[in-house]
């Protein structure tokens, strides 16, 4: 069996960063975006975290994490270091 190398295909995704505080314009924008895509499948925690129902189960996005909307339309959290190593800004949605 041969080990092959693969490069991730370029795909444009949408993403938003979980803000440090609830009740801010940024938090309101995130809430609206997630409600449009997930409806009742999103929960906001008192500590500012967001829980998202995904195909793999409920996943938590802490403040400072990113929430990604994949090419297939699924939402999932991503830690900042992984996000910045994987994605670059290409423009506004």
Predicted feature locations:
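Short, compact, well-ordered microdomains
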Residues: 54-93
């Amino acid at each position: 069996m041969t080990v092959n190398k693969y490069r991730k295909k370029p795909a444009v995704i949408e993403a938003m960063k979980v803000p440090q505080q609830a009740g801010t314009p940024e938090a309101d924008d995130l809430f609206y975006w997630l409600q449009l895509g997930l409806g009742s499948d999103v929960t906001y925690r008192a500590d500012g975290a967001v829980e998202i129902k995904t195909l793999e189960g409920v996943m938590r996005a802490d403040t400072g994490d990113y929430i990604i909307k994949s090419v297939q339309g699924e939402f999932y959290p991503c830690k900042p270091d992984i996000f910045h190593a994987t994605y670059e800004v290409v423009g506004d949605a």
